[in-house]
Regions:
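GST-like domain detector, emphasizing the conserved glutathione-binding G-site
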Residues: 1-177, 181-184, 281-288
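GST-like fold's C-terminal all-alpha helical module
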Residues: 2-3, 134, 138, 145-250
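Acidic/histidine-enriched, glycine/proline-rich intrinsically disordered or flexible terminal extensions
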Residues: 21-23, 260-288
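Short, solvent-exposed turn/loop segments enriched in Gly/Ser/Thr/Pro and often Arg
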Residues: 81, 207, 259
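Phosphate-coordinating loops and pocket residues in cytosolic domains that bind phosphorylated ligands
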Residues: 94, 248, 257-258
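C-terminal anion-handling pockets and recognition modules
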Residues: 253-254
Length: 288
């Protein structure tokens, strides 16, 4: 159950070989490791990302805006391969000093506006284009309640449960039990909310749904961590209903494959520069 021989040192030191699946990119300091200018495409919105749950939040939002006919939401999505350290380039760190995807630059302003942290990007795009974040104070506040709930919950589901259950080089019973308990508690919170509402924040589909679905929707649908059975995901019937409903939205189907580098080749679009890329440049087409 536990390695009782381990005793923490008085002062921690970095063991570069001890980070498991992410040992080559995890480090205790910030800042760039190399100089590299980021590519820039033809649209004002330049997204630098990877198709993880956090990355999917933003590409789903952008595709939803485009589905409404918001032409100003056209964007270039550039792939940041975090396993190769792209997030530590000088160009990326200029946008996000925290070296985490996604990062967005809006070149329609002079000087350009940088936006980092996925929740901040969702709010920025909602405010900029006037969609998916209600103007009514009570509804806006409820949407933000759930957006920030997700921002606090995701590290427990991903960095906690997902890491120790799926990625960690050794299975630690205490850690898996600790974070499974929290993951299931969070699923129960969400299930009870969705028992009374079609969408997370009420009657409307909002940025709260776009933020929460890539994490909790993907988990209960078995798309990440291979943990749906372990978590007894089928017992959360309201989350299941909502997750399947959101998954069927055309913009979600598009957004979830942008900058994706795993899974079926027809669900990987490494870069996105216009709508035709979904038909012409998925990896199954590129490799044929």
């Amino acid at each position: 159950m536990a390695d009782n021989t381990y005793q923490p040192a008085k002062v921690w030191t970095w063991d570069k070989s001890g980070g498991g699946a992410f040992a080559n990119i995890n480090r205790p300091v910030s800042g760039p490791t190399h100089d590299k200018t980021l590519p820039v495409g033809k649209h004002p919105l330049q997204l630098y990302s990877l198709g993880t749950p956090n990355g999917q939040k933003v590409t789903i939002m952008l595709e939803e805006l485009l589905a409404l006919g918001v032409t100003g939401a056209e964007y270039d999505a550039w792939l940041i391969r975090i396993g190769e350290g792209d997030q530590f380039s000088s160009g990326f760190v200029d946008i996000n000093p925290n070296s985490k995807i996604p990062a967005l630059r809006d070149n329609s302003h002079n000087p350009p506006i940088r936006i980092f942290e996925s929740g901040a990007i969702l709010v920025y795009l909602a405010d900029k284009f006037g969609h998916f974040l209600p103007q009514d104070l009570a509804k806006r506040t409820e949407t933000l309640n759930w957006l920030f709930w997700l921002q606090g919950a995701a590290p427990f589901l991903g960095g906690g449960f997902g890491h120790f259950y799926h990625y960690a080089p050794v299975k630690i019973e205490y850690a898996i039990n600790r974070f499974t308990m929290e993951a299931k508690r969070l699923l129960d919170v969400l299930d009870k909310q969705l028992a009374h509402h079609p969408y997370v924040a009420g009657e409307e589909y909002t940025i709260a749904d776009m933020a929460i679905w890539p994490w909790f929707g993907n988990v209960v649908l078995g798309n990440v961590y291979d943990a749906a059975e372990f978590l007894d995901a089928g017992s959360y019937q309201n989350v299941q209903r909502w997750a399947k409903q959101v998954a069927e939205r055309p913009a979600v189907k598009r957004g979830r494959i942008v900058n994706r580098t795993n899974g079926p080749l027809n669900e990987q679009l490494h870069e996105r520069h216009d709508a035709s890329d979904f038909e012409n440049h998925t990896e199954d087409k590129r490799q044929s």
